Amino acid sequence: MYLFSLTGVKRGLITSRPSKRCKTPYVADVILDGEEKEVEELCHSPSLGCCGLVEKGKQVILSELSSDKTKCSHRVELAILREDKNPEREIIIGINPKLGETIAELCLQKNCILGLTNIQSYRRETKLLNSSLW
């Protein structure tokens, strides 16, 4: 059984974060794998750095953004980590916080968490007093 699937993903190499063209830390310049021309694309990076996983020279997995309202063509979803002692081995790490929220929600809906079955109600990203809980 699959719980969640990312479709239409591409791999890419981060060349600059923040972007040289858009100085927000939530945008990175990325060269997409498999493209004829090496063109830097603006890519939304919804998390800040992730302990060095979203920095220059790092490989990532991206999803395509279809909205005309954004300057970014893709969103960074996952990081690819390679160990020094075993560089052929890829460790894929989720770095988009929304992915974690979506997967947790699906687990609740499908009763995948022992001790948290048949949940009647829940809310995502709920404010508590003057702060928000993620």
Residue ranges and their predicted role:
Residues 1-106, 112:
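Nuclease-adjacent, charged terminal/linker segments that flank catalytic cores
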Residues 18-20, 92, 117-134:
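Active-site metal-binding core of divalent-cation-utilizing nuclease and nuclease-like domains
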